[in-house]
């Protein structure tokens, strides 16, 4: 099946636009995640893709074929897509085999062919030998695999997944992430995945679409979205970030921003002028802390305000001379003590500047 093309999609519920002017292209065989907070429109987009909803404007195409528009919607059963729901939606009175074979039964696939396909997909998801068990005899992770197998057995070109891991405990959720990604690679099916979990999106995806209030804010590989956020909203949503207020001292690609009265060398986007207020974004893991200053622009005197051991890293809260707070995280930070005077380095390569 060819790629997905979504063009200027609009879906309203009364006066509220759940999805507004949303456009996206997904390549064949790609794993794309729709990421955003509750109410951002990601599940609505998934339901529009599935054919459960009709758009008020815009078009959804797969391989050049129009599947959805205000004029009409191709029924879900004719789209060549599978869907895995958050709640698993497995029938408790049917065995694993009967749950997985349901779509084949509806399609009147011959019994011998159905048995072959069910056996193959159960092996694929790690449920071989459990055909005769009922859902009540399975763990949560196994029930989720039943839901996956049921969607895969009909051999869809596209698989839609609506927060399928949210009901699992943390350790099982982490293991299932790897299994999902491995499954997608082995099958070559295009996965469109919905979640509000940033770590999940980064672990699974070839590309991430970050949504807010029904609009697309940024679309790209996980590393780009995390390290080079397109806006303050994306930077804040994608994980812990320091947002430091400053003013442009010298515009340009080799610019300087004054933060807490000290010069910080950083590349500035076009359009910023001298004296303009800005915010400098940097992740805690990219903040350097040392007992001595190295003399470069980008070093800020600070005091260690708080230290918290988090297991793999130490979380360090720092107070700059003007009272501004920022955080650093790293393995070596447990060598410092609360109240100690230190020097903070903001590496220009890891800084992103947003206009005020």
Please name every model-derived segment.
Residues 5, 25, 61, 343-345:
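ABC ATPase nucleotide-binding domain
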Residues 22-33:
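Pre-Walker A (P-loop) beta-loop-beta motif of ABC nucleotide-binding domains
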Residues 227, 256, 260-307, 334-356:
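Glycine/charge-rich catalytic "coupling/switch" loops of P-loop NTPases
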Residues 76, 80-82, 86, 90-233:
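ABC ATPase nucleotide-binding domains
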């Amino acid at each position: 099946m060819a790629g997905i093309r979504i063009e200027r999609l609009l879906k309203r519920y009364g006066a509220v636009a759940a999805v507004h002017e949303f456009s996206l292209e997904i390549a064949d065989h790609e794993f794309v995640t729709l990421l955003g907070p509750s109410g951002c429109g990601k599940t609505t987009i998934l339901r529009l893709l599935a054919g459960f909803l009709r758009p008020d404007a815009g078009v959804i195409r797969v391989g050049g074929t129009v599947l959805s528009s205000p004029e009409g919607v191709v029924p879900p059963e004719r789209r060549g897509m599978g869907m895995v729901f958050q709640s698993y939606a497995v029938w408790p009175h049917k065995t694993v085999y009967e749950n997985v074979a349901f779509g084949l039964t509806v399609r009147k696939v011959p019994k011998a062919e159905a048995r072959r396909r069910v056996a193959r997909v159960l092996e694929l998801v790690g449920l071989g030998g459990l055909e005769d068990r009922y859902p009540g005899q399975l763990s949560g992770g196994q029930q989720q695999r039943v839901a996956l197998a049921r969607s895969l057995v009909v051999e869809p070109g596209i698989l839609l997944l609506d927060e399928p891991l949210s009901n699992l405990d943390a350790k099982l959720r982490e293991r299932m992430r790897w299994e999902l990604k491995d499954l997608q690679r082995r099958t070559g099916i295009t996965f469109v995945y919905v979640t509000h979990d940033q770590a999940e999106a980064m672990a699974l995806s070839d590309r991430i679409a970050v949504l807010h209030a029904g609009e697309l804010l940024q679309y790209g590989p996980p590393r780009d979205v995390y390290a080079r956020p397109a806006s303050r909203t994306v930077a804040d949503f994608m994980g812990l970030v320091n947002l430091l207020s400053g003013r442009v001292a010298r515009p340009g690609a080799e610019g300087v921003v004054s933060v807490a009265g000290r010069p910080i060398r950083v590349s500035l986007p076009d359009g910023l002028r001298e004296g303009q207020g800005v915010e400098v974004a940097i992740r805690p893991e990219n903040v350097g802390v040392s007992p001595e200053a190295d003399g470069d622009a980008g070093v800020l005197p600070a005091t260690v305000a708080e230290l918290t051991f988090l297991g793999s890293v130490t979380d360090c809260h720092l107070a700059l001379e003007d009272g501004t707070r920022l955080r650093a995280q790293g393995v070596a930070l447990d060598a410092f003590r609360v109240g100690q005077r230190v020097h903070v380095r903001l590496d220009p390569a890891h800084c992103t500047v947003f206009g005020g």
